[in-house]
A protein has these predicted regions:
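Active-site-proximal cap/loop segments of hydrolase catalytic domains
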Residues: 163-287
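Glycine-rich His-Gly loop
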Residues: 61, 133-137, 217
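Residue-level recognition of a conserved intra-blade site in WD40 beta-propeller repeats
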Residues: 5-7, 49
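Short coil/turn segments that connect the beta-strands within blades of beta-propeller domains
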Residues: 8-10, 54
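A fold-wide structural signal in alpha/beta-hydrolase
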Residues: 130, 155-165
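Non-catalytic accessory segments flanking enzyme active sites
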Residues: 22, 35-123, 149-152, 156-157, ...
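Serine-hydrolase catalytic-loop signature spanning alpha/beta hydrolases and amidase-signature enzymes
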Residues: 138-140, 161
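Short beta-strand element of the alpha/beta-hydrolase
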Residues: 118, 125-137
C-alpha cells in the first residue's frame, strides 16, 4: 500500500512520482499541507511505518549509483540510519559512469529536463556514439541502476547516454502530463528531436552521425514515429512498440484502457487523424 496513516502524529504518508525520482511525502492534516521527507535515496520503492511505534519507519531505495539500500527513519528527528547495503561491495568493484542533469528550454518555452551519463573512463578528446532514451507509457525514466534499460548499462558499452523527459510524463505537474492526452507523438517527437540536436551541439564529444534512440511501449511507439519525422538517428530500437494506433485501441484490455485516457473522447470514427496520421504504419513511406 503506497499510503500509510500514522496514528502517532495523525498524518498520512505516501509515495509520489516526483520528476525522475520516487519520494515519500506526508500530508499534514492540521495545516492541510504537504511535506517531503528528507530521505537518503532518490528512488524509494518501499516505505513502512512500524505498527507499534509509528514514529519509526523503514525504507529501501536507490539511485544512479546504488540499489537496495535499507534505512531506519526517525520521524521525530527527521534522520535516517543505514540498516543494510548488500550491494555496496558489488558496486565498489564496478566502474560506473558519471551522471548529471542536463536540461534545455524547448522552442515553446517549456523546460525539458533530462540527464547525461558518460561512459566509464570517459575521455573528452574522443568522439562517442549517443543513445537517446525516453519514457514509456508515460512514466518518467526514473533514476536507478537496476532497470534492463538503465543508462549505466548503455554507458558501460562505451556510449554517451541522454535520458530525456519530454512532455506527457507524469511527475512534472498536471499541465505537463496532460499534454499526452489526444497527442500521440505531438510535442513529444518535436521535443526529442530538438533536445537531441541541442544536446549534440552542447557536447562536442558526441558523434552526431552515430545517434541511436530507444524506448519501450509508448516509448517504442515514439521510436517508430520519430523515424517518420527525422533522419538524425542512425539506429532505432522499438521495444513493444505500437505501429498502428487503431489496432492498439481495439486489441486487448491494455489498448482500450490506456486509450481511454491517452485518447480521451477520441475514436477511429470521430477522430480518424489521431489514429492514422500518428502511427508509423500509415507513414512508412517517410522513413
Amino acid at each position: 500500500n503506497s499510503a500509510n496513516w500514522n496514528r502517532t502524529d495523525g498524518n498520512i504518508y505516501f509515495q509520489v512520482t516526483d520528476e525522475d525520482c520516487e519520494r515519500i511525502y506526508r500530508y499534514i492534516v492540521k495545516t492541510a499541507s504537504y511535506e517531503r521527507l528528507p530521505l537518503e535515496e532518490d528512488v524509494v520503492k518501499n516505505f513502512s511505518l512500524a505498527a507499534d511505534a509509528p514514529q519509526v519507519a523503514a525504507y529501501v531505495g536507490g539511485g544512479n549509483y546504488s540499489s537496495g539500500v535499507a534505512y531506519m527513519y526517525d520521524n521525530k528527528k527527521s534522520q535516517s540510519t543505514l540498516f543494510a547495503n548488500p550491494m555496496a561491495d558489488v558496486y565498489k568493484a564496478i566502474e560506473l559512469g558519471e551522471m548529471s542533469e542536463w536540461n534545455f528550454t524547448a522552442a515553446d518555452g517549456t523546460l525539458i529536463k533530462g540527464m547525461i551519463c558518460l561512459p566509464p573512463s570517459f575521455d573528452s578528446s574522443r568522439k562517442y556514439p549517443l543513445i537517446v532514451y525516453y519514457y514509456g507509457g508515460t512514466t518518467p525514466t526514473t533514476r536507478g541502476i537496476t532497470s534492463p534499460y538503465c543508462a549505466q548499462l548503455f554507458a558501460s558499452r562505451d556510449y554517451v547516454v541522454y535520458v530525456i523527459q519530454p512532455s506527457g510524463a507524469i511527475g512534472f505537474g498536471q499541465e505537463f502530463s496532460a499534454r499526452h492526452v489526444n497527442a500521440w507523438g505531438d510535442w513529444t517527437a518535436d521535443e526529442i528531436i530538438e533536445g537531441t540536436m541541442k544536446f549534440c551541439a552542447a557536447h562536442p564529444f558526441v558523434d552526431a552521425k552515430r545517434i541511436g534512440c530507444i524506448g519501450a511501449s509508448y516509448g517504442g511507439f515514439m521510436t517508430q514515429y520519430l523515424q517518420t519525422k527525422t533522419d538524425i538517428f542512425a539506429a532505432a530500437v522499438s521495444h513493444a512498440g505500437i505501429s498502428n494506433v487503431t489496432s492498439y485501441w481495439g486489441e486487448g484490455y491494455w489498448g482500450y484502457s490506456y486509450n481511454a485516457i491517452a485518447a480521451a473522447g477520441s475514436y477511429p470514427w470521430n477522430n480518424p487523424d489521431l489514429f492514422v496520421k500518428h502511427g508509423s504504419l500509415f507513414n512508412a513511406d517517410k522513413i
